[in-house]
């Protein structure tokens, strides 16, 4: 029987005799427990909502195709980049970061930019954002960021005080905060923004030579943003504005595209780099490490079912393929465990069997035979009766030494090193970013900052003004004026930076 026959059954195939009237004792009597269809419907309904993502809960996604447009085989042996013109299927999910599933799309917030490439050597997940940097550089602060931007435990409301108290306790956050308070803090929609891998990653070629890389994805639709006032009007009329724009564009054949670029740094250049090249709060200047074109991806197919493909999409930085690798970036290293662990909690240990997460280029039957059982193991015959241990005398499931990675550079004693003794250059790059803005754009940064700090205590405002001033005096003066604070009343030249370790208000 097909869906087109229009005949209703229960979940196990039994025909449903009446969809509108419950089984009762008499026409007005109580319900009977033997109304199995009613019980089945309600029990399923009670359980159909899965945990939302702790961050990036509100998202939109689409399928597409990545095409190589430039030869980078000198840097990587990854098969998806093996020849110009080669195409790889992919899935993309964009998101806001702070809000819940029902949050408005046009909020001032970072956007998640997560890509899943179905390569012939397995899935490659690049889990990035629409900004090239982040608020901090040590992953021990991840949980506190979540707390600061989410709801207050007492009021259950999002708190600008908590947000800014956290940000201003970290002088290295100013770079990301400056981007967030700039015009690019509210993209008009998902099609008109850039994406970044943000972290430093690495590539290695067939000779075992490693280079450090950063990934960039430049929208081919152009950059378009919203002011605070425009965003408020959008939210008032359509809380799903970005999701609607992406879905409708693809549905109408207006397929969005992004060009992929990399920046490349050799190991020798990294050793001599002015700053820590693995610091997520800093960028590599394009003049020193120019963008190298790699390819282009196009999103050209909407999911048939949002829950099936977007809500159940699972991304993890640990999903990587031969020719691509990690770096000493502490923030990247700190993400390697929790992403997969969160998916196992949210979707189950066998979430890799969900269609959107399946490694299409490899084949389910060829996947790890030693990971078995678990809830909802529904594909691949649970690896059948073959050996589920190694070594075994059947000569199957041997290692593949030809895919060994080149040695990963690491040295030093295990210790909780003070990051601030290693690098306290917090303000150079946000200062340069500020000076790149037009006079009108600078004024909008001041206004946006004042709007975002509404309700924040004066000590926190002063702390932020001090950081802005150290990046550029005009930056500090402009923010102070917008906040209505006399800048001459602030100690602007204090030698001790105000970190969470040493607040001087």
From Swiss-Prot:
* E.C. no: 1.11.1.6
Q: Which reaction does it catalyse?
A: 2 H2O2 = O2 + 2 H2O
- Kindly give the CDD domains that the UniProt entry links to this protein: catalase_clade_3
The record's InterPro entries line, in alphabetical order, gives: Catalase (IPR018028), Catalase_3 (IPR040333), Catalase_AS (IPR024708), Catalase_clade1/3 (IPR024711), Catalase_core (IPR011614), Catalase_haem_BS (IPR002226), Catalase_immune_responsive (IPR010582), Catalase_sf (IPR020835)
Entry keyword annotation includes Metal-binding: yes
Residue stretches spanning the membrane: none
Q: What class of enzyme is it?
A: oxidoreductase
In which domain of life is the source organism classified? Bacteria
Q: Which Gene3D superfamilies match?
A: Catalase core domain
Kindly state which keywords UniProt assigns to this record, in alphabetical order: Heme, Hydrogen peroxide, Iron, Metal-binding, Oxidoreductase, Peroxidase
Q: Which residues form the active site?
A: 56, 129
Region (Disordered) spans which residues? 1-25
What cofactor does this one take? heme
GO cellular component terms, alphabetically, are: cytoplasm
Protein residues bound to heme: 339
According to the UniProt entry, its GO molecular function terms are:
catalase activity; heme binding; metal ion binding
- Entry's Gene Ontology BP terms: hydrogen peroxide catabolic process; response to hydrogen peroxide
Q: How does it assemble?
A: Homodimer.
The free-text function statement in the UniProt record for this protein reads:
Decomposes hydrogen peroxide into water and oxygen; serves to protect cells from the toxic effects of hydrogen peroxide.
Instruction: Name the family.
Output: Belongs to the catalase family.
> This protein is called what?
Catalase
Source organism of this protein record: Staphylococcus warneri
């Amino acid at each position: 029987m097909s869906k087109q026959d229009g005949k209703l059954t229960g979940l196990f195939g039994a025909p449903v005799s009446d969809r509108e009237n419950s089984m009762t004792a008499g026409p007005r009597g109580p319900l009977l427990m033997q109304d199995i269809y009613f019980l089945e419907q309600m029990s399923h309904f009670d359980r159909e909502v899965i945990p939302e993502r702790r961050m990036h809960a509100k998202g939109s996604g689409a399928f597409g195709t990545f095409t190589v447009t430039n030869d980078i085989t000198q840097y990587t042996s990854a098969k998806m980049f093996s020849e110009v013109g080669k195409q790889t299927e992919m899935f993309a999910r964009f998101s806001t970061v702070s809000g819940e599933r029902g949050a408005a799309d046009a909020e001032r917030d970072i956007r998640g930019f997560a890509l899943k490439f179905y390569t012939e050597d397995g899935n490659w997940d690049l889990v990035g954002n629409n900004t090239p940097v982040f608020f901090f550089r040590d992953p021990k602060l991840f949980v506190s960021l979540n707390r600061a931007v989410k709801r207050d435990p007492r009021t259950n409301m999002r708190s600008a005080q908590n947000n800014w108290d956290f940000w201003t306790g970290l002088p290295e956050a100013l770079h990301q905060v400056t981007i967030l308070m700039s015009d690019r803090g509210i993209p008009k929609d998902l099609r008109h923004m850039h994406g970044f891998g943000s972290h430093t990653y690495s590539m290695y070629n067939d000779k075992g030579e490693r280079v450090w890389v950063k990934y960039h994805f430049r929208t081919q639709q152009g950059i378009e943003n919203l002011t605070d006032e425009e965003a408020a009007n959008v939210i008032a009329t359509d809380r799903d504005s970005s999701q609607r724009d992406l879905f409708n564009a693809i549905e109408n054949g207006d397929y969005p595209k992004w060009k992929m670029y990399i920046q490349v740094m050799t190991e020798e250049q990294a050793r001599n780099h002015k700053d820590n090249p693995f610091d997520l709060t800093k960028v590599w200047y394009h003049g020193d490490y120019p963008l190298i074109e790699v390819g282009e991806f196009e999103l050209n197919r909407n999911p048939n079912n949002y829950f099936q493909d977007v809500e159940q999409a699972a991304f993890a930085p640990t999903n990587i393929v031969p020719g691509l690798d990690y770096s000493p970036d502490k923030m990247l290293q700190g993400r390697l465990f929790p992403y997969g662990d969160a998916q196992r909690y949210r979707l189950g240990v066998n979430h890799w069997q969900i269609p959107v997460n399946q490694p299409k280029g490899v084949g389910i039957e060829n996947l790890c035979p030693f990971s078995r059982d678990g809830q909802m193991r529904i594909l691949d015959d649970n690896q059948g009766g073959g050996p589920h241990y190694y070594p075994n005398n059947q000569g199957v499931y041997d290692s593949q030494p030809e895919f060994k990675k080149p040695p990963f550079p690491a040295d030093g004693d295990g210790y909780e090193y003070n990051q601030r003794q290693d690098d306290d250059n917090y303000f150079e790059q946000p200062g340069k970013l500020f000076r790149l803005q037009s006079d009108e754009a600078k004024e909008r940064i001041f206004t946006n900052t004042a709007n975002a700090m509404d309700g924040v205590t004066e000590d926190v405002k002063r702390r932020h003004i001090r950081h802005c001033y150290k990046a550029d005096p005009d930056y500090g003066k402009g923010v102070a004026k917008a906040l209505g604070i006399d800048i001459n009343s602030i100690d602007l030249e204090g030698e001790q930076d105000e970190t969470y370790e040493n607040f001087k208000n």
